[in-house]
Every structure is written in structure tokens, then in C-alpha cells.
Amino acid sequence: MTTDRTYPIFTVRWLAVHGLAVPTVFFLGSISAMQFIQR
């Protein structure tokens, strides 16, 4: 298992997915909270 060239790509891809997923979940959560507070 000496895949040194695939490992950094997987790491960058993992960081990119989480870097986009975390703000998206937080953004959707804040929108749902605003909708709930307004009503």
C-alpha cells in the first residue's frame, strides 16, 4: 500500500468535501432557524 501519489489527492479531496459540507450544513441550519424564529 505505497500509494504516495494517490494519498495527497484523497486528502485534498476530503478537505474540499468537508470544507464545503460544513458551511453548507451551518448555512441550512441558520436558515431553518431564521424561518422558525420568524414564525
Swiss-Prot record:
A single MF term (Gene Ontology): iron ion binding
InterPro entries, A to Z: PSII_cyt_b559_bsu, PSII_cyt_b559_CS, PSII_cyt_b559_N
Keyword Thylakoid carried by entry: yes
Cystine pairs: none
Necessary cofactors: heme b
Protein's cellular compartments: Plastid, Chloroplast thylakoid membrane
Keyword NAD carried by entry: no
Binding residue positions for heme: H18
Membrane topology: Single-pass membrane protein
Pfam families: Cytochrom_B559
Gene Ontology cellular component list: chloroplast thylakoid membrane; photosystem II reaction center
Entry keyword set: Chloroplast, Electron transport, Heme, Iron, Membrane, Metal-binding, Photosynthesis, Photosystem II, Plastid, Thylakoid, Transmembrane, Transmembrane helix, Transport
Purpose: This b-type cytochrome is tightly associated with the reaction center of photosystem II (PSII). PSII is a light-driven water:plastoquinone oxidoreductase that uses light energy to abstract electrons from H(2)O, generating O(2) and a proton gradient subsequently used for ATP formation. It consists of a core antenna complex that captures photons, and an electron transfer chain that converts photonic excitation into a charge separation.
Protein name: Cytochrome b559 subunit beta
Protein source organism: Cedrus deodara
